């Protein structure tokens, strides 16, 4: 559900535009920002060439009000949505920034690429695109003609499956980009620790449920395969009637992680423990919904991480994109009310 974008620097080129045309382009840039901040990332070259070119176009905007508002859009995207990747400048007869732009298109087949404005006349993006034999599935759009496409993408904010949903499609369409373009991933599933009376009373030993062991093994391996540098935080949600066995719960997950690390030596997994509490009038209640929260977007998932059955067949599920403001609120609540587990 996370969409990778490539932005040609000349979408920020206001040269020669009348006031009404400037306002129209600014509106399109705002709509684009809304889409990216809701469910996307902007891929840029690690050398910073594209970013510098955008800076140059914005610096040349003659209208100070338009310039300020455009810079606000760019600054917001740079702060929250930029992801650097290594690119190789193409040796083609086109503008230098176009060579970096199309390099991104070649490297990332499912990228959503936005080009030009009416002043992009020296080189026609459509012609360049067709001459480069880039895969047809690449999305290439003119900045002034993306209203309809933006709305289509924004409308599709959830996926519900009650039938057989191919596992590979699920990974590619929903999880892959979330994992690939994020630095951190927080997984909150308050059903992962079962509320079993005999365990809570220490009459029987606590253990991780078998379905969660299956899913943790599978998804940690998949995450490591896609992005071995991704730092994963798994929340351990301890209810009021489980406080007595908190250490037992913590130790069981630490032991489980050690077993996982034998299969996945480079596993980047840490635990954060969150306890329900009503002490001194401070009521901490763990959220009912389950989440995958990255530094880019957040997904609400009714299954949590318990997505597969014992045969690795995908269960029915309902996954929704979380509003960016709600994402910040949820992430802050979980962080404030949890502590990092000391595994020593």
List each model region and its residues.
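N-terminal, charged amphipathic alpha-helical interaction modules
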Residues: 191-192, 196-197
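Metal-dependent nucleic-acid phosphoesterase active-site entry motif
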Residues: 10, 190-191
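Structural motif
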Residues: 184-186, 297
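PLD/PLD-like phosphodiesterase catalytic module centered on the HKD motif
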Residues: 1-167, 172-175, 197-344
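Secondary-structure "cap/kink" motif recognition
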Residues: 178-184
